[in-house]
Every structure is written in C-alpha cells, then in structure tokens.
Curated annotation (Swiss-Prot):
This is Large ribosomal subunit protein bL20. It comes from Psychrobacter sp. (strain PRwf-1). Transmembrane segments: none annotated. One of its GO terms (biological process) is ribosomal large subunit assembly. The keyword rRNA-binding applies. Belongs to the bacterial ribosomal protein bL20 family. It comes from the Bacteria. One of its GO terms (cellular component) is ribonucleoprotein complex. The keyword RNA-binding applies. One of its GO terms (molecular function) is structural constituent of ribosome. InterPro entries: Ribosomal_bL20, RIBOSOMAL_L20_CS, Ribosomal_protein_bL20_C. NCBIfam families: rplT_bact. Binds directly to 23S ribosomal RNA and is necessary for the in vitro assembly process of the 50S ribosomal subunit. It is not involved in the protein synthesizing functions of that subunit. The gene is rplT.
C-alpha cells in the first residue's frame, strides 16, 4: 500500500484556524498551536455571551421602561401589573422603544395602566 501524506489536509486545517484567529494579538494570530487555543476559547465566550445577550437586553429594556414609568408616577412593577389588568399585551422590547422615542404614547399607556389599577 502507498504511504498517505497528510500535508494538504494539515495545511487546510492550519489555514482555517489561522484565518479565524486573524486580528488576534501576537502569537495568537501567527502560531498554530496557540491560535487553536485562542479560537476555541473565543468560541466558548461567543456561546456563553449569545445567551447572556438576551438577559442583558431584557435588563436594559426594564431599566428604560422603569425610567419612563417613574416620569409618569408609577413604578415598573405597578406599570406592568396595570398593563396586564388592562389586557394590553406589548412586550418589553416594544415598550422600551416607545418609552425612548414616543413619550406621548407611553404616557397614554401609563394612564391606561393607572386606570386598570384603580
């Protein structure tokens, strides 16, 4: 049987890893062995942070809604409770956007929430 040389596959694999490590500092972008570790770790961070991003954005939306609600004399929890009682189903992302960009509409929502709480 003929001897199998794996140079082509090795070069391809190395090139693929070094391409993904492009822009990394120092040896991380040049030395294959170090680049493999850097790329693997980057993948772990990316996986973790794709999940954390959802939490982070939810926290941001809640902070924005709370700020808007307090300007209209309600706390966040009472505002959300009022919306639920008034059967207004708007998600937090949209509520935060309304609070930031359309103060009049948000004030109208807070008035409806207050009415439902009374």
């Amino acid at each position: 049987m003929a001897r199998v040389k794996r140079g082509v596959q090795a070069n391809r694999r190395h090139k693929k890893i070094l391409k993904r490590a492009k822009g990394y500092y120092g040896a991380r972008s040049r030395v294959y062995r170090v680049a493999v570790q850097a790329v693997t770790k980057a993948g772990q961070y990316a996986y973790r942070d794709r999940r954390n991003k959802k939490r982070t954005f939810r926290r941001l939306w809640i902070a924005r809604i709370n700020a808007g609600a307090r300007l209209n004399g309600l706390s966040y929890s009472r505002f959300i409770n009022g919306l639920k009682k008034a059967n207004i189903e708007i998600d937090r992302r949209v509520l935060a956007d309304i609070a930031m960009h359309d103060a009049a509409a948000f004030t109208a929502l807070t008035e409806k929430a207050k009415a439902a709480l009374a």
